[in-house]
Amino acid sequence: MSKFNRMHLIVLDSVGIGAAPDANNFVNAGVPDGASDTLGHISKTVGLNVPNMAKLGLGNIPREQPLKTVPAESNPTGYATKLEEVSLGKDTMTGHWEIMGLNITEPFDTFWNGFPEEILTQIEEFSGRKVIRESNRPYSGTAVIDDFGPRQMETGELIIYTSADPVLQIAAHEDIIPVEELYRICEFARSITLERPALLGRIIARPYVGEPGNFTRTSNRRDLAISPFAPTVLDKLNEAGIDTYSVGKISDIFNGEGINHDMGHNKSNNHGVDNLIKAMTSEDFKHGFSFTNLVDFDALYGHRRNPQGYRDCLHEFDERLPEIIAAMKEDDLLMITADHGNDPTYAGTDHTREYIPFLAYSPSFKSSGLIPVGHFADISATIADNFGVEKAMIGESFLDKLV
């Protein structure tokens, strides 16, 4: 009999809570990450009002300087701590894979200055189409088609771009480059990015339609990921016949491995919360685990170094938290965490190497307080412990602390 019949894990993408001990080994535009602090700097510079997360214990998480505008609760309703990453990376896939129990000792490659000429030339030779060199850098997916879509419509050239994560994305107007052709080109790109110096987590086909000034991306997106290099706790749950629900890009991050119910991509954080609540209130979801990623913090505000937008996005999630809690059953456990930092006040535009917050709440709790500081993979070890399956490579369960 599981202590918690259902467990729900929400990753607030990039919501770090202060520089990790090894942060100075990671850099942003030449500046070490040692002074990064996503939540701390948002709270200090633009104010942060998240009463529902504060009630669970967000302001109680141990820090050298308390969060300026998030007070500690004398009697929180949940358990709280912060967790440290052991893997050699600060990207989305590394963070999520470690949360699910893997230790990534060979990080994926990211391309802040765009992909090397060798890769672009191989794609050109395979496809018979030229690549627009000016788009070959980290780019917003909507901005890149606004900037280069008109040219693509005239020339048929490929729009290839990347992001802070280890991904290669190809945008193609469906009337100019048919979707099936785009998929073939992406499959070729996948075949040449499976090992270093270009080990990429995902190749993403990004079809779009419309006219200049009014382009829209279509639902024909396709992700060509790589599977985790070892079984994760998702795999262990799936093998044991336990329901696993994915909300947002979780299924992409794990290449579908270990997931038996995919609620689809999120159009926004609010849409993701809607999808999570839909899963939680489904008649079919009686026992098991849901895993949600809410990416707007990172994609819309962290990389763009927009602390006000990031703060507002946190406020928006906090306002929805009571709805999520209302969808819980008595023996459910809700866990809220992150996958890395992305301090919107920091140098550069990359992720930041930080501790992640961890909050846990159940209507069945008889107590509350702090859990000892641990590591990302402790989350999956706790999930495995609860459902009676093996943990993955690393992680120590804190299930016995949740009472």
From Swiss-Prot:
One family name in Pfam for this protein: Metalloenzyme
Molecular functions per Gene Ontology: magnesium ion binding; manganese ion binding; phosphopentomutase activity
Co-factor(s): Mn(2+)
Annotated CDD domains: PPM
Source organism superkingdom: Bacteria
Function in brief: Isomerase that catalyzes the conversion of deoxy-ribose 1-phosphate (dRib-1-P) and ribose 1-phosphate (Rib-1-P) to deoxy-ribose 5-phosphate (dRib-5-P) and ribose 5-phosphate (Rib-5-P), respectively.
Name by which UniProt lists this protein: Phosphopentomutase
Organism: Streptococcus thermophilus
Gene behind the chain: deoB
